[in-house]
């Protein structure tokens, strides 16, 4: 079964699929505009499985397509967006909040295993 099918219904969902040492591997599906945020203590990696992610930075936008990846350096403010949606694998250290340094209605307190 496709792990993405186990995620909650909706435009935004995250699920934990693996841990390695102090890192978590998560799957994410997203459509729309996320919030501006940063991760002050860690880099963040997105590997796009399906669709297109537009990573917004204050000085530019980077389009990341299926089969491509992007690493967001620690401390860099960014805002993911996707008009038609994307599915991705997200790699970051264990316990990193999904909204980084910002609390919002998009913050997920505990990401569940799928």
PLM features per residue range, with description:
Residues 74-102:
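Ligand-binding loop in jelly-roll beta-barrel domains
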Residues 10-11, 24-40:
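Conserved short histidine dyad/triad with adjacent acidic residue
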Residues 22-24, 31-33, 52-54, 61, ...:
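Short, charged/polar surface micro-motifs in flexible loops or helix N-caps
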């Amino acid at each position: 079964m496709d792990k993405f099918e186990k995620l909650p219904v909706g435009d935004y969902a995250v699920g934990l699929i693996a841990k390695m040492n102090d890192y978590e591997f998560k799957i994410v599906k997203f459509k729309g505009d996320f919030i501006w945020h940063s991760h002050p203590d860690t880099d963040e990696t997105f590997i796009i499985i399906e669709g297109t992610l537009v990573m917004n930075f204050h000085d530019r936008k980077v389009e990341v397509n299926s089969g491509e990846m992007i690493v967001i350096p620690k401390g860099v403010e960014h805002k993911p967006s996707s008009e038609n949606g994307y599915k991705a694998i997200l790699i970051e250290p264990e316990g990193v909040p999904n909204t980084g340094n910002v609390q919002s209605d998009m913050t997920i307190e505990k990401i569940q295993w799928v």
